């Protein structure tokens, strides 16, 4: 496994052999690189995940609430896949908020939802769960991120957002 460059001034080193990267350069007709800044048009790209990545099975449970530690300094998106044969209200909150301020009514047996990387910045804990009957359901949670390596060899995410086309086989990134 190769270590990735450290994000910002973080002391955390991430080792991975499951990440993919994409390098983009815009060249003029003479082959010289043209620096660019985003404007009102966003640039989108899809980065495939490593096909050798073992996708975890969904977890069968009847627990009402779950806690997820957001332990990285890198901004991440959090993705949920839920299979339930009953209507419920999906709720979530960050850190020590006293009430669940975010909720979604769900009346379908398979539900996908994401919290994008702009919403998780600065948070350390995500609590999510279900309001409704205490019945068995299956769920899976995973994360994604979109980053670039700056001139100081540090990973940054300024101007990059994880998109809704992200799934278990690809990460959707766009510059805003």
Predicted regions located by residue number:
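Extended, hydrophilic extramembrane loops/domains of integral membrane proteins
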Residues: 166-176
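Secretory-pathway extracellular proteins and peptide precursors enriched for disulfide-bonded cysteines
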Residues: 136-138, 162-166
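Regulatory and partner-binding modules of innate immune sensors/adaptors
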Residues: 152-164
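Long, contiguous ectodomains of secretory-pathway proteins
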Residues: 1-155
